[in-house]
Every structure is written in structure tokens, then in C-alpha cells.
Amino acid sequence: MSSTAIIGDDDVLEPTLQCLLDQKTLRWIFVGGKGGVGKTTTSCSLAIQLSKVRKSVLLISTDPAHNLSDAFGQKFGKEARLIDGYDNLSAMEIDPNGSIQDLMASGGADGNDDAMGGFGLGGMMQDLAFSIPGVDEAMSFAEVLKQVKSLSYEVIVFDTAPTGHTLRFLQFPTVLEKALSKLSQLSGQFGPMLNSVLGARGGLPGGQNLDDILSKMESLRETIAEVNSQFKDADMTTFVCVCIAEFLSLYETERMIQELTSYHIDTHCIVVNQLLFPGKDNACQQCGARRKMQKKYLNEIKDLYEDFNVVRMPLLVEEVRGREKLESFSDMLVHPFQPAHED
């Protein structure tokens, strides 16, 4: 697929991400791929473009290696913060690992009635929670959703962790629903005994009772079920795959697309980064060899993903850091790069 112009043929999709800007119903956009392929640069640039056509945009990093702060040259944390130079684009960085202890320890401590409250279940419930595979990602993502739900953003862009973690991350609604259903089932069977034990030990923290906790857990389950439904709605959610033209990256991309399809999550855009476009008389043998290899995998991408919007991005001479360079990079996501020479 040529990146020198937007192709008008109805049988060929445009090599841009303009379709994401035009789809006004989108609320959740995930950007992911193998490590080191330019996910953060792509997600930041896409968020910048979205901010030009949407009222409010939130960019969230769920990658423990948080690069949003480095990309924009501005410190971000667990709370959403406006990005310098924008009045409708905010960012936040949340580590999806290791927050379950904090959630359980803080549940109900301040007496609020939010959906994540009431998780001071004692050692027995903590052991049960930790025994459920994937519950750490699930609980952490629920914390993200709690913060997101308390704010008002028209579209949310996720800069995700490398492929394997992201795929587990996207399973969280199912995992959490199963976990909460299991806890509810156990409470039905052992509720009286638990109440007796808890009563003998002075009850739960904050003076809560088991019924209140179960009620909050059911409320949380309903919230997760709603988000799960939205994630599987192609009008509201899509996943942008980022890769480079190499075997391992293409393999990871194909595996990710297969997994996303099995989760019923829409994906129809691929960004291929770090492409070489050597000049016609370039004498660099390494450049020529690498370009030859890249062309091979670009042809495979063209054959495999003919029904995808495939964006081809050049290898740049400088790092894409700071607002000005991100703005320039983002323009190439909607206006295809035109190399001086292309063999």
C-alpha cells in the first residue's frame, strides 16, 4: 500500500488514522504492540489529533515504564493533569501492578461509598483474592475506571504495556466478574459463619458489615459489565496496533489481532513505524539491506491486512520528544508521509 497519497479506490482503505477522528462515537482507543516500536509516540500523537476534533481527551499510560512524562517533558501521576499548551487534553500514568494491597487497605477507611470501597476483608479474603489469576490487573484496571468515571472525557486513549501484559489487561472485565461472582457465591454459603467469625474478632474495619461489602461488590460488578459491553462495541472501542517491519514485531501483531478478535474487540488500524526511505543514490549498504527486509514485511502486511488502515511512518533522525515534535509526528498520522524517493 503506497503512503505517497490518500488512495481513492473504494477497495483500498486510506493509509491514515483519519477514520478514528471521523468516528465520533469512539470513547475508548487502545494503542499497543511489542516493546520499543513507538507505542507511546503514536498514542501521544493520536491524542493530539483527537484534541483538535473532540471537546475533551484523556491520555492514560498503563505501562509500568511510563513514558508520557518523557514524551511531553512534563510530570504526570495518578491524577489527570492538563498537558501544557492544551486546554482539552489531559494525561495520567497508572501502574497496573501492585495496587491491590492499597485498594484493600484503603477500602472504607474514609467512610465514602464509592464502588471500590469496603474491601477491608481481612487476611482470609486477601488470600482468596490473590489466588484468583489475573486479579491484580483486574483490580488495578477497576481503579483506573473509578478515576476515569469520576471525570468527564469524550474520548480516552490508552498507551498500553507491551503485548503480553496488554492482552491480560483486556481480559480484566471477565476475570473480575468471575471473581466477584465467586465471592458472592462463597458469601452465600459461608455468610453466617463469616459474620460470626468477624463479629467475634470485632467486625470489619470502619464498622462495615458483610452485606454492605457484598452490595458494593455487586455494584462494581455491574459497572465492570457495562464497561465490558462498551469494549466489545466497535462503535465505542477500537485498538490501534503499532509495529515495525520485522519478523518478531509482525508475529506479535498477528498474535495480538487474533487475541483481540477472540475478545470481540475491534481493530482495523495498524501503524508501521521506523521505515527507511533511502535516497536513490544512497551508498549505505546497511540502509539498502534494511530497506529490502522492510519491503518484504510491508508486502506481507499488505497481504495479511488488506481490510486495515495501514499507516507507514518514517524513521526519523531525532527522537520525538516535546510538543513541537509530537505535533509534527501526529500530522503524519493523518497526512501520509511522502518520501523523496521510494523504490
Curated annotation (Swiss-Prot):
One of its GO terms (biological process) is pheromone-dependent signal transduction involved in conjugation with cellular fusion. ATPase required for the post-translational delivery of tail-anchored (TA) proteins to the endoplasmic reticulum. Recognizes and selectively binds the transmembrane domain of TA proteins in the cytosol. This complex then targets to the endoplasmic reticulum by membrane-bound receptors, where the tail-anchored protein is released for insertion. This process is regulated by ATP binding and hydrolysis. ATP binding drives the homodimer towards the closed dimer state, facilitating recognition of newly synthesized TA membrane proteins. ATP hydrolysis is required for insertion. SUPFAM superfamilies: P-loop containing nucleoside triphosphate hydrolases (SSF52540). Its EC number is 3.6.-.-. NCBIfam families: GET3_arsA_TRC40. GO terms for molecular function: ATP binding; ATP hydrolysis activity; guanyl-nucleotide exchange factor activity; identical protein binding; metal ion binding; protein folding chaperone; unfolded protein binding. ATP binds at K34, G35, G36, V37, G38, K39, T40, T41, E246, N273. This is ATPase GET3. It is found in: Cytoplasm; Endoplasmic reticulum. Keywords: ATP-binding, Cytoplasm, Endoplasmic reticulum, Hydrolase, Metal-binding, Nucleotide-binding, Transport, Zinc. GO terms for cellular component: GET complex. Homodimer.
